[in-house]
C-alpha cells in the first residue's frame, strides 16, 4: 500500500507533503500493529502475518518464564512487567539484528534465528537461558528469573 501511495504523482489526491504525512502515519500504524505495547518486541500478529509461513531456514525457540504467576502474586504486577522487560533486554543483548523476538502472550516468547546451524543454535539457547538466570530485575533484587527453553531447526 505504501508503495502505491509513493507512485502517485503530485497532482493525484494530495501534494507531496500530504503524501509524506500519509506514508509516515501508515508506517506508525504498522509499527503499532506489530509491536507488543508492554515490551516493545514483535507481537503474535507479526508472527502470524510475517513469519509463520516463511520458507527460510532458521532456528525457532519457545521461551517461557517459569513461575510468572508467582512473581505477579508475590511481588505485584509491576514486578511481573519488569521481569518481562528484563527477559526482553537480556535476549536482545544475546541476539543479532536479524533475529526476531516475538511475544506470543503472557510470559511466552518465540525467538526466530535465521540461518543458524545446530551447534550455534544450541549454544545460543544455553547462553540466553544462563544470561536470564543471572539477570537482575531492577527494583526487585530478591527476584531470580528462570525460563524454560525449547527449540527446533527448520529446513
Feature locations, PLM:
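Signal-transducing coiled-coil linker helices
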Residues: 2-37, 44-59
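Conserved nucleotide-binding and Mg2+-coordinating catalytic segments in signaling enzymes
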Residues: 29-49, 63-77, 85
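Active-site-flanking beta-strand signature of metal-NTP-handling nucleotidyl enzymes
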Residues: 59-64, 101
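Active-site-proximal alpha-helical element of nucleotidyl cyclase-like catalytic domains
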Residues: 79-100, 108
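Short helix/loop segment flanking the catalytic signature motif in cyclic-nucleotide metabolism enzymes
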Residues: 83, 110-128
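Alpha-helical scaffold within the catalytic cores of cyclic-nucleotide enzymes
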Residues: 88-89, 120-138
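A short pre-motif secondary-structure segment
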Residues: 100-103, 143
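A short glycine-enriched loop-to-beta-strand structural element that forms part of the catalytic core
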Residues: 112-114, 140-155
Amino acid at each position: 500500500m505504501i508503495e502505491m501511495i509513493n507512485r502517485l504523482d503530485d497532482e493525484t489526491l494530495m501534494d507531496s507533503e500530504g503524501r509524506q504525512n500519509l506514508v509516515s502515519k501508515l508506517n506508525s500504524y504498522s509499527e503499532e500493529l506489530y509491536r507488543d505495547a508492554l515490551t516493545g518486541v514483535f507481537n503474535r500478529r507479526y508472527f502470524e502475518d510475517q513469519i509463520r509461513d516463511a520458507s527460510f531456514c532458521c532456528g525457532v525457540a519457545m521461551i517461557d518464564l517459569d513461575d510468572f504467576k508467582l512473581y505477579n502474586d508475590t511481588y505485584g504486577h509491576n514486578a511481573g512487567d519488569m521481569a518481562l522487560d528484563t527477559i526482553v533486554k537480556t535476549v536482545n543483548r544475546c541476539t543479532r539484528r536479524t533475529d526476531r523476538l516475538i511475544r506470543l502472550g503472557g510470559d511466552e516468547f518465540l525467538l526466530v534465528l535465521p540461518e543458524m546451524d545446530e551447534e550455534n543454535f544450541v549454544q545460543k539457547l544455553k547462553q540466553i537461558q544462563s544470561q536470564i538466570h543471572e539477570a537482575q530485575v531492577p527494583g526487585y533484587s530478591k527476584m531470580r528469573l528462570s525460563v524454560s527453553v525449547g527449540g527446533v531447526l527448520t529446513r
